């Protein structure tokens, strides 16, 4: 009996050590994925882990990139699909963004869970975008996006969590890898 208890204890200890290491490794993990015509570099959020910040480049022009980000919501708003193709106001690191973000996908996952994917406007020079984002990141030590209110739209109506942050450590290297 003692041997069985010892073996179970050792297995449990090893499982916890490996699990803890895996969780810590995922916090700083970047994903670089190649698709038919574009490459995506992505990072999980700190507030909501499943919400990703994605940088995408067309394989034919790796000098310009765009940004996609998602917000998951558990609010069961009956008109959440009405957000499709809308432009929503956002703040980045507390600064209002004039061009806002366009909703490109509203996807129901489960009965009460939806993912809303948005795109920051336009493709920008990789160099200029990385420099601007890293300046914001180094100033506050995070890169945060917040959904904000405007006349006719209150993000609290649709989203239970209206902000997320991402660590951008190693972003320049990951973009170079994606290029």
Could you tell me what each predicted segment is?
Residues 1-25:
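Classical Sec-dependent N-terminal signal peptides that target proteins to the secretory pathway
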Residues 23-179:
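A generic "folded-domain core" signal
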């Amino acid at each position: 009996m003692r041997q069985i208890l010892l073996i179970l204890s050792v297995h449990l200890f090893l499982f916890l050590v490996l699990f803890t290491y895996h969780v810590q490794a995922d916090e700083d993990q970047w994903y670089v994925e190649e698709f038919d015509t574009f490459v995506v570099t992505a990072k999980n959020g700190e507030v909501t882990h499943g919400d990703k910040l994605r940088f995408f480049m067309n394989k034919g022009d790796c000098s310009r990139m765009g940004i996609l980000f998602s917000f998951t919501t558990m609010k069961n708003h009956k008109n959440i699909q009405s957000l499709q193709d809308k432009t929503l106001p956002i703040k980045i690191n507390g600064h209002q963004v004039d061009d806002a973000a366009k909703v490109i996908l509203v996807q129901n996952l489960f009965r009460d869970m939806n993912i809303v994917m948005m795109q920051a406007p336009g493709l920008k020079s990789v160099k200029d975008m990385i420099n601007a984002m890293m300046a914001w990141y180094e100033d506050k030590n995070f890169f945060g996006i917040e959904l904000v209110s405007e006349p006719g739209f209150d993000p609290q109506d649709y989203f239970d969590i209206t902000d997320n942050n991402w660590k951008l450590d190693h972003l320049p290297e990951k973009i170079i890898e994606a290029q």
